[in-house]
Amino acid sequence: MGMSQPGVLLSLLLVLLPQTWGAEPRLPLMYHLAAVSDLSTGLPSFWATGWLGAQQYLTYNNLRQEADPCGAWIWENQVSWYWEKETTDLKSKEQLFLEAIRTLENQINGTFTLQGLLGCELAPDNSSLPTAVFALNGEEFMRFNPRTGNWSGEWPETDIVGNLWMKQPEAARKESEFLLTSCPERLLGHLERGRQNLEWKEPPSMRLKARPGNSGSSVLTCAAFSFYPPELKFRFLRNGLASGSGNCSTGPNGDGSFHAWSLLEVKRGDEHHYQCQVEHEGLAQPLTVDLDSPARSSVPVVGIILGLLLVVVAIAGGVLLWNRMRSGLPAPWLSLSGDDSGDLLPGGNLPPEAEPQGVNAFPATS
């Protein structure tokens, strides 16, 4: 059988493209998909995030029904139909995942979390190295081979889901086409049109607050909002002198940026002697904030916080997923049990005094 015209064009592009990526780490393009049967957690029934390496560039859920860019990728000079195509493809995957969840519920008692990690990276010759693995309730149970068009695995549930999807018209062909053709096309497109986004730098805005602690102490919370890249260094100052970095944590926002906070226990009544300072790639010099005095970087902090209320500021699995993607683990499976369920909610473990209020993690409309 002859190769289709799009396939010929892609092959020529992969051959003719200068080998400029060879000297640098090759970024994978990955989609993390998840569907749940138990909606009591307040999560959507289906959601997806798209990643270029450890940088999130896309979000989608069944409530909004549109694929949206994240972070600096909002300004990527994409072709006009690109996000419509992403939306169409993710709606198809949403249908497959939700049908699988319903079928599992009908045949097996229990609740289910079905996840997929689909994507590709470019081999040294710029051909596609596809990934298509699936997990059920936090454990890998199935793989898809795009060259044979088969879903396979050792679990009984593999037969249930795999046979269901094999019966769907064109499902295997579309999945193979996505992994071998569409995915490398998109990855090349992002590298060509949005290469500068990989060097995106967004400076943080900050605030420092205090709350009562135990045994006559106070707890200072230094929070940094809406910054990228995620590496950020905290420092507490007492009367202008370094007084430690506190206990620090970092997590992703749903818009591709990050938030972080650090906690320091001090003597009650001593709070106003302290300042908080951060160092970040997006800042020309360290940014320092006094207690209860919002600092300004390149954008007023009020605008940053208000903006957080208007965008999707938390993606399901955000904290745990980002940490696993960044650490290079093979699959960011979430079990939706124990502590994992907390990582699926807005803002991770951001302290209440540092978190913008009134945020809906999955708004149905923009």
Swiss-Prot record:
Modified positions (Phosphoserine) in chain numbering: S335
Residue numbers spanned by region Alpha-1: 23-111
Start and end residues of each stretch annotated as Alpha-3: 202-291
Topology, Extracellular side: 23-298
Function noted in UniProt: Cell surface receptor that transfers passive humoral immunity from the mother to the newborn. Binds to the Fc region of monomeric immunoglobulin gamma and mediates its selective uptake from milk. IgG in the milk is bound at the apical surface of the intestinal epithelium. The resultant FcRn-IgG complexes are transcytosed across the intestinal epithelium and IgG is released from FcRn into blood or tissue fluids. Throughout life, contributes to effective humoral immunity by recycling IgG and extending its half-life in the circulation.
Family stated for the protein in its record: Belongs to the immunoglobulin superfamily.
Subunit structure: FcRn complex consists of two subunits: p51, and p14 which is equivalent to beta-2-microglobulin. It forms an MHC class I-like heterodimer. Interacts with albumin/ALB; this interaction regulates ALB homeostasis.
Protein name per UniProt: IgG receptor FcRn large subunit p51
Species, as recorded: Rattus norvegicus (Rat)
Gene: Fcgrt
